Regions:
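A helix-centric hydrophobic-segment signal that preferentially recognizes long
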Residues: 2-165
Length: 165
């Protein structure tokens, strides 16, 4: 009926081929997983970059608005402008280096907004209130983007440090 004579060499070759195929498939799956996670990290960093750019774009408007009402706060406005220029000059740096300069910009912007309390006319200005709202919204979006980035990096680090991937 059936010829059950197996060639032992053919069986060994078939088993080796299956093992090689399984290993190759495993390597491809692992590589794709790493590539997807690395892409997610890059995309999440771009989300942070978008919000940082938005914050950078709001600073000149804030400086102009505050300067109209408070001629005596020029040192604070100069500090904010310098912090913005410094942060913008480090766009291509690593996230850690850039974060340091962005934190300085955030602190300078918060100082200007806090100092505005001393100027009731400025505080009541619709333009200033809108800028405050936009800055607060940007900071919230930046916080969410940072959390998303941190989660993506954490997942990538776990993939790198565990076996099997």
């Amino acid at each position: 009926m059936f010829n059950l004579n197996f060639n032992p060499l053919a069986v060994v070759i078939a088993v080796i081929a299956v093992i090689i195929g399984f290993v190759a498939l495993s390597v491809i799956v692992m590589y794709n997983r790493f590539a997807r996670q690395a892409q997610l990290v890059a995309e999440s960093w771009h989300g942070i970059d978008v919000e940082l750019t938005r914050r950078h774009d709001l600073v000149p408007n804030l400086v102009r608005t505050v300067a109209q009402y408070s001629a005596y706060e020029s040192s604070l406005l100069d500090q904010l402008t310098r912090a913005r220029e410094s942060a913008a000059g480090h766009r291509g740096d690593s996230p850690a280096v850039r974060a340091e300069f962005e934190d300085q910009l955030g602190t300078a912007a918060a100082s200007v907004v806090a100092r505005a309390e001393a100027y009731p006319d400025l505080k009541a200005s619709a333009n200033f209130q809108e800028l405050q709202r936009q800055l607060a919204e940007t900071e919230n979006q930046l916080s969410f983007a940072r959390q998303y980035y941190n989660d993506a990096v954490s997942t990538l680090n776990k993939l790198v440090s565990t076996i099997p991937w």
